[in-house]
């Protein structure tokens, strides 16, 4: 038990150290090979995040931007952190599976409670011909990643969810925070117009940081 606790502390310290070392500005960059991205800090139990999610998915589809999701757990949400840890587990199985799990949780959010979260997760896993182990985070490393992501958000002064930025790989085009969700597509087009022409267009993907 003592060894397991020490291991968990070490993993958490390493994850938090990585988050602090990277600095908040590194989170506001698109993944390698992409010119633009939507960076979102979200909580899986947040109703506003659930409302915004289809719009983010549509933006990825329509504009070819990457979507970088960050965990930002709201402390008074009883099942949110565990759902984020589950999502991290599915990321390990397949990044697309993790993405689909997040969309699934958002789509069914109003029916999910702390007591039935596991049932919903098992239902998702079964529908995708996989299984969620009884102990899906035995060493605490996934929990540490979720908590480290939340630290990154705090360092960026994230106070509410979802917090969304349109970011680019150009130093001349600074990140733009979306304050009115209705203007997301308009903002993407405006930011895209500021980028210099490039030979290859970005591939449509969802990414984890």
Task: Identify what each model region corresponds to.
Residues 31-33, 60-62, 79, 155-160:
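Extracellular/periplasmic catalytic domains that process cell-envelope and extracellular macromolecules
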Residues 44, 50-125:
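Structural alpha/beta surface segment adjacent to cysteine/selenocysteine redox centers
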Residues 42, 53, 71, 168-170, ...:
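A mature extracytoplasmic/lumenal domain signature
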Residues 1-5:
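Positively charged n-region of N-terminal signal peptides that target proteins for export
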Residues 7-17:
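Bacterial N-terminal signal peptides
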Residues 32-46, 67:
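Short active-site neighborhood of thiol/selenol oxidoreductases, capturing the structured segment around
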Residues 22-36:
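A short beta-strand-turn-helix
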């Amino acid at each position: 038990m003592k060894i397991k606790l020490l291991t968990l502390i070490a993993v958490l310290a390493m994850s938090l150290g990585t988050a602090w070392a990277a600095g908040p500005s590194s989170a506001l960059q698109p993944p390698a090979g992409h010119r633009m991205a939507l960076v979102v800090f979200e909580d899986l139990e947040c109703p506003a995040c659930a409302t915004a999610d289809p719009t983010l998915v549509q933006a990825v589809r329509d504009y070819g931007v990457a979507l970088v999701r960050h965990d930002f757990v709201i402390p008074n949400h009883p099942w949110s952190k565990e759902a984020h840890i589950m999502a991290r587990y599915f990321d390990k199985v397949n990044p697309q599976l993790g993405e689909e799990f997040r969309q699934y949780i958002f789509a069914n959010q109003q029916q999910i409670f702390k007591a039935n979260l596991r049932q919903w997760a098992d239902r998702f896993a079964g529908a995708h011909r996989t299984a969620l182990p009884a102990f899906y985070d035995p060493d605490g490393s996934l929990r540490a990643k979720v908590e480290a992501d939340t630290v990154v958000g705090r360092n960026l002064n994230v106070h509410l969810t979802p917090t969304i930025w349109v970011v680019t790989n150009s130093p001349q085009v600074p990140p733009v925070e979306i304050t009115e969700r209705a203007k997301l597509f308009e903002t993407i087009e405006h930011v895209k117009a500021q980028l210099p022409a490039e030979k290859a267009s970005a591939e449509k993907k969802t990414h984890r940081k």
